[in-house]
Amino acid sequence: AASGLDLAIMGTSCDAIDEASDRERFEAFARRSGLRMPRGATGTSADDLREAVDHIGFPVLIRPSYVLGGRGMEILANQQQLDGYLKEAYLAPDKPLLVDEYLGHATEIDVDAASDGEEVLVGAIMEHLEEAGIHSGDSTCFIPAQNISEAMLERIAEQTKIIGLGLNIVGCFNIQFAIQGEELYVLEVNPRSSRTVPFVAKASGLPLARIAARITIGQPLKDQDI
């Protein structure tokens, strides 16, 4: 049952979805797992946000928690822009805003994968044409990645497996990474199918959605003809 309701949830559990989506819980998971994230903080008031920006330093990326499609996301480069954002922002204790260090001149990477709780299948590692900070829905990406070293691709695949198994994901999931110099950062994890899954299927021939659907009904990766 899920959240006290008489409903059976197939695939990734509600708790695992919350751990991937909740800022503080995921940061704790990342620390335990040895994953690097941009410096960040959460705020529910103007004072919270000003304190976070003072600690992190400009530029910062501010966005609401638990939203899709990049709604409300802004890159702020100075105090004037922060003041303007705070005038328009909706602030409430139950509607936190996330403040992150903005990684300038970083390459964004999208990964689509599937996990059955025992194994992880990395469907594709996609390189974005635009720098990190442009929402992935507005960005062009490539399969295969064009400018990423084999060593970095191996690190990305390894961290994808750590995340999929560590969060107990069952089915599809998507990870957004950023590469800045030789550093690899985890930007966010989406414990679900993403907008790029159809692109992965067309470009690679790998039916990731079908594979993930079979996982959710009890067919592990080892029993699928992949």
Model-derived regions: residue spans:
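A short, GP-enriched loop/loop-strand-helix hinge that lies immediately N-terminal to
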Residues: 1-21, 36-42
